Amino acid sequence: MSFSVDMLANIAIELQRGIGHQDRFQRLITTLRQVLECDASALLRYDSRQFIPLAIDGLAKDVLGRRFALEGHPRLEAIARAGDVVRFPADSELPDPYDGLIPGQESLKVHACVGLPLFAGQNLIGALTLDGMQPDQFDVFSDEELRLIAALAAGALSNALLIEQLESQNMLPGDAAPFEALKETQMIGLSPGMTQLKKEIEIVAASDLNVLISGETGTGKELVAKAIHEASPRAVNPLVYLNCAALPESVAESELFGHVKGAFTGAISNRSGKFEMADNGTLFLDEIGELSLALQAKLLRVLQYGDIQRVGDDRSLRVDVRVLAATNRDLREEVLAGRFRADLFHRLSVFPLSVPPLRERGDDVILLAGYFCEQCRLRLGLSRVVLSSGARNLLQHYSFPGNVRELEHAIHRAVVLARATRSGDEVILEAQHFAFPEVTLPPPEAAAVPIVKQNLREATEAFQRETIRQAQAQNHHNWAASARMLETDVANLHRLAKRLGLKD
């Protein structure tokens, strides 16, 4: 196959047509996969020696949550270093990062792989990866043709990232600084609640307002505070953390405001408090609802007047500190109960943010699971850690009262258990590796299969036919929707349906 001028023109038009939309990256990767007829493709952004998936097609959903560090993925490192088209032979000894991550083909290793590094000028900004199950799948394309695709994709990615940068900074095109890849935060999630939270973070980060971050335990409030600080004008100065719940009353005031030598028994020298440490930066007060009323009054004075007094000192010190506070309590209820000052609540909650619990974030649980799987893979030196379909189903139906923190611990424990029961450096997480209490999975809508004399192949094909028919009926005969429901690739589903006689 060779690309005609019309085909290349159509690709360019399609890539640029969606560039201002939220689904810009998915449109790009879907178009390229259709043209190149590959089993799986991914668009990756390069940042700090790791590749971050922006869009995938034909790969398991948890890939979007993974962060591919170059030192743990020799193929991706080769792509980053090459500066040109990279073709990996079918018998390459370098492990493919997507082995076990193509739905419906978990037991098979990727055979054909092409990597296209994407550049903006001399800067590496990303990569396009193309994978196939047939060893010679990409032999029909010349390197020159693939370079053209890479150039088109690089231009589209560069423009899209620049637009995203301008949107996040609320800048006009004429005010734009030279293109820089956006900083990666570990706030992983594409659910509506997380998308809205990220937008609100972008809005408030550019200001100097105090922010109250509320959310259940384990939802990631500290990550929100970090994201606000890193996107703010104060990012070059310190972000200082203090857990108010861990402060004994006897030392809480000293921790916040510091003390002078001799202020109390054990004060053998002058000591700066957290407010002084955070001067010109940001102070994150976690579990703010645990502060005593006496300390709340002193904190209020700092927010009102911008000065502090060290314990044992009559002099005031001016500080310029932005305060971010977090709580898992309902502070309005605490105010009504007399346990939290109303005036302090209003000072802190100038711009309130609410972090959604994991049970309300839909498929984000799978993205986060992928992120933690990749962390475990690197930490334990494994070649791959993947989720079985049963494990994904279990994770999606568990309520996670401990939220993201509970998911992280569950993945780490499951990897250790799975590794202990399997030799080698490949780990597949099954449902039985998770110890969740009282998880009720929806009953499968199994078809009534008559008991007849069939061999195993015939029985398997009969089951596959009925499963595909049910999926098609439930999805109004939409093949793409049926493929998503069955967690398989739409191209593979088409091929299977043809083999089973379900379509021409």
Swiss-Prot record:
Residues 479-498 bind DNA. Pathway: Nitrogen metabolism; nitric oxide reduction. Keywords: ATP-binding, DNA-binding, Nucleotide-binding, Phosphoprotein, Transcription, Transcription regulation. Residues 187-416 form the Sigma-54 factor interaction domain. GO terms for molecular function: ATP binding; ATP hydrolysis activity; DNA binding; DNA-binding transcription factor activity. InterPro entries: AAA+_ATPase (IPR003593), GAF (IPR003018), GAF-like_dom_sf (IPR029016), Homeodomain-like_sf (IPR009057), NorR (IPR023944), P-loop_NTPase (IPR027417), Sigma_54_int (IPR002078), Sigma_54_int_dom_ATP-bd_1 (IPR025662). Required for the expression of anaerobic nitric oxide (NO) reductase, acts as a transcriptional activator for at least the norVW operon. Activation also requires sigma-54. The modification 4-aspartylphosphate is found at D57. It holds the Pfam family GAF. This is Anaerobic nitric oxide reductase transcription regulator NorR. NCBIfam families: PRK05022.1. HAMAP family: NorR (MF_01314). ATP binds at residues 215-222, 278-287. The keyword Cell inner membrane does not apply. GO terms for biological process: phosphorelay signal transduction system.
